[in-house]
Amino acid sequence: LMGIGGALTGCGPAFIDLIIEALGDAGVKYGVPRKQAYEMVSQMILGSAKLQLQTGEHPGVLKDNVCSPAGTTICGDALEHAGIRAGFIDAIDAVMNK
């Protein structure tokens, strides 16, 4: 059986690639060329990861820091309503139970 470290670091890249693909598809939907959309999303993920590593801040704090009251980013909480957090946890559960 794969340990949790292996599950997070071995399977995690595929999950992140799915995020890149999905956000890239959203960019394409709104007129961004696919290659450019993937680059934009990949750079955003890289920047977010670097910021978390450099500051040591809890990811929830970093998320809240970029959400203005009644702003556009907080509208993205639709991801929570769609169950993204539970989906990731369920995916790791499936890996751990394989």
Feature map (PLM): residue ranges:
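Conserved Rossmann-fold dehydrogenase catalytic segment
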Residues: 1-14, 33-36, 58-59
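N-terminal glycine-rich phosphate-binding loop for ADP-containing cofactors
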Residues: 15-32, 77
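N-terminal alpha-helical segment
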Residues: 1, 19-23, 44, 72
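NAD(P)-dependent Rossmann-like dehydrogenase/reductase catalytic/cofactor-binding core
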Residues: 28, 39-98
